[in-house]
Amino acid sequence: MKITVQKSIIENILIHAQPFLEKKDTSQITSHVFIDASNNRLTLKATDYEIGLIVSTDNLIISQDGNVTANGKKLLDIVRILKEGEINLEVKSDILYISQSHSKFKLPTFSYNEFPVFPVSEGKSRILINSHSLIDSLKKITPSIDINNPKFELNGALIDIKQNSINFASTDTRRLAVVNIDNQSASELSIIVPKKAIVEIQKLFFDDIELYYDENYLIIHSKEYTFFTKLINGKFPEYSRIIPKEIKNTLILQKAKMIEAIKQITTISTDVKITFLNDTIIFESLSDDNIEAKTEINSITGFVTPFIIAVNSRYLLDFLNTINSSEFNIGLNDSNLPFVLNDGNFKTVVMPIVI
């Protein structure tokens, strides 16, 4: 293999590949990227077995077709240190040579035949969804995905595919986030996508996309990328049962005012006590020491008697920071029962702190 490519092009490709590499054990072939130069195209693959990425470009010169693997992190480190302009990559005797002007580097390679085989979309069901709807939905539910939960299914997000709609859901057991979008699908299936995959999808896809899935994999194609992730095998909680069926009190609140008040309290305490009066909402810190914070905003609530809830401020801010509207709804029942934050097709059910 012998190619010449602009630094900016190969650097950008290698940067996108980094999250997909095995970082801890460099003896594993999954710490390497797979590079194929053929048919006037460069194709690069990276995978840690759980998620994988294919990136390709025809913006290069191929002097000799071929394949090679090389440590993805070290190759990026070398490319980064070089100047802007053309970089030469050439394989000789199972060694990858990287050169530019008077600078020369070489990296050992593994047998490219040992590189993992990627799943293919043929024979899998297809989801018709535009990238904006997908990314917007995933962005809203990402903060509620748990990490390191012994119940593996909670370390991912549910994509509940129905014939006329798709529900995106996540929970860390203290809150539940759900986004519902209208969407046509040929078949129904619920899949659980790992959090790492959810995060990477949001970085990659902005243009037209095609989604394919089965019980084991989710595959996404765009003009620039092909992405896959293994799915989590488990049973996601019955999220529809967690959402309160009836709401006693629904308030319309200003997002900016709420964020400002909550952030003032978080300088002292993560947990905040909120008291709803008839025309005022009071915010107070909940802290074990003698440090206190208190602020209030003017807002007509309709409460005749004070209504108090206590909550982890992060749950409120995560919701407020992902919505685009200037106003949102909060649905309240009793102080110690879950309350609901609403913005259009997005809702978050939050368990309050019992005080």
What name fits each language-model region?
Residues 1-355:
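Structural preference for solvent-exposed beta-strand-turn elements
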